[in-house]
């Protein structure tokens, strides 16, 4: 049975609320100068908290609740790891807000490796005990998610020697190391972590799947996640088209092929899941799935060099892509999981108002970012009141999270486990 620790998920949602609030301030800074705010420091704190405070903490809660037995979930080590990680998140956040990214904050990031390594080791050890020799497809995806989670930290660990050797914080090697971390977080840990939870849901409801097909799907996605990193190398060395073609035509087409192989199976799975799902959960999961398909298409489209250059130089497109993965895929799926298994069902007509506001806000922001990026691309320039409009739409995200947290508190008697 899948369970959720209400206290932990509320902490993760509070982290997400701070992330969204910071993002709103960053938008407002383009309308009115905020003399008290160091933009770069806030921006760095924003993405750090998004990755470690929201996605990682929420995944931590959901993975433990989905993959471990109640007895394993109650072990002291998981409670200790959660609160140590949350304490470190607060320390890193305050460091970044006040001092920005430095050797000290890199050291703090390395501390995450220790805590995350402890979590991964503990989960894998307990999974071996609870699952025995039973090869579950969800476990296989989870192991790959953990592989990418740990692999991504090579990007952070390498920053210190790069700065010492090259004495240039913004050197090409610094760029490649930071992108290494982000790439394997967004395209590895996020995606495979979500898929592991999705397949665990399928197993939980006793739905049979073609495991051979989905193992082929898994291998192709794994190869594509590794190959698509070459796009970052191309952006670092734009004269070398071979890197672009490897990433976009190779990695992109592999992902499209992977999705094509299981497209009918996914349709069948959604059909069999429908009777089990909250109506809001079903909509959110389809939203995340469509966003995932759009992500794959975009990775193929930028195989054309001019489009790849546009994607890099027009900041609106870059932000829209990161938001597509972080908000439209990862966050939407995590909300869907919370609605489904934290029992936030439509007890009242307005129970999921926060979910609706969140979905509308992120979709509107994505469309506006892509529209403004296209206007810049064709030489039209900025639309009238663009910054005011995107600020107002972004404001809906923290408001929606407040509503979601309120619902978690209001129905805290559901889905609770040992605190």
Predicted regions and their residues:
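Hydrophobic alpha-helical transmembrane segments of multi-pass integral membrane proteins
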Residues: 1-419
């Amino acid at each position: 049975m899948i369970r959720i620790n209400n206290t932990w998920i509320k902490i993760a949602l509070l982290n997400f609320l701070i992330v969204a609030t910071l993002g709103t301030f960053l938008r407002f800074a383009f309308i009115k100068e905020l003399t008290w705010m160091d933009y770069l420091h806030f921006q760095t704190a924003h993405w750090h908290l998004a990755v470690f405070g929201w996605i990682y903490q929420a995944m931590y809660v959901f993975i433990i609740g989905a993959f471990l037995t109640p007895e394993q979930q109650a072990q002291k080590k998981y409670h200790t790891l959660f609160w140590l990680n949350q304490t470190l998140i607060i320390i890193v956040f305050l460091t970044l807000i006040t001092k920005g990214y430095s050797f000290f904050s890199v050291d703090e990031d390395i501390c995450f490796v220790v805590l995350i390594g402890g979590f991964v080791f503990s989960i894998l050890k307990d999974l071996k005990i609870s699952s025995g020799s039973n090869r579950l497809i969800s476990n296989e995806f989870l192991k790959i998610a953990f592989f990418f989670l740990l692999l991504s930290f090579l990007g952070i660990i390498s920053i210190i020697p790069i700065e010492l050797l090259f004495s240039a914080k913004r050197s090409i090697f610094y760029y490649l190391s930071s992108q290494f971390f982000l790439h394997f977080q967004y395209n590895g840990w996020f995606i495979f972590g979500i898929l592991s939870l999705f397949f665990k849901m399928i197993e939980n409801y006793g739905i049979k799947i073609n495991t051979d097909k989905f193992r082929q799907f898994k291998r192709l996605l794994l190869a594509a996640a590794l190959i698509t990193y070459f796009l970052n190398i191309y952006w670092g060395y734009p004269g070398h088209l071979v890197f672009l073609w490897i990433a976009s035509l190779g990695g992109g087409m592999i992902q499209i092929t992977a999705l094509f192989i299981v497209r009918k199976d996914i349709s069948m799975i959604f059909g069999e899941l429908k009777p089990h799902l909250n109506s809001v959960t079903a909509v959110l999961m389809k939203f995340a799935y469509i966003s995932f398909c759009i992500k794959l298409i975009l990775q193929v489209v930028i195989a054309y060099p001019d489009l790849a250059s546009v994607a890099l130089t027009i900041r609106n497109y870059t932000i829209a892509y990161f938001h597509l993965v972080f908000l439209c895929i990862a966050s939407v799926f995590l909300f869907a999981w919370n609605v489904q298994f934290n029992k936030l069902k439509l007890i009242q007509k307005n129970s999921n108002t926060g979910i609706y506001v969140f979905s509308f806000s992120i979709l509107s922001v994505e469309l506006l970012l892509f529209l403004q990026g296209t206007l810049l691309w064709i030489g039209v320039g900025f639309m009238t009141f663009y910054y005011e409009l995107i600020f107002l739409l972004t404001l809906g995200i923290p408001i929606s999270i407040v509503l979601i947290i309120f619902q978690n508190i209001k129905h805290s008697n559901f889905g609770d486990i040992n605190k």
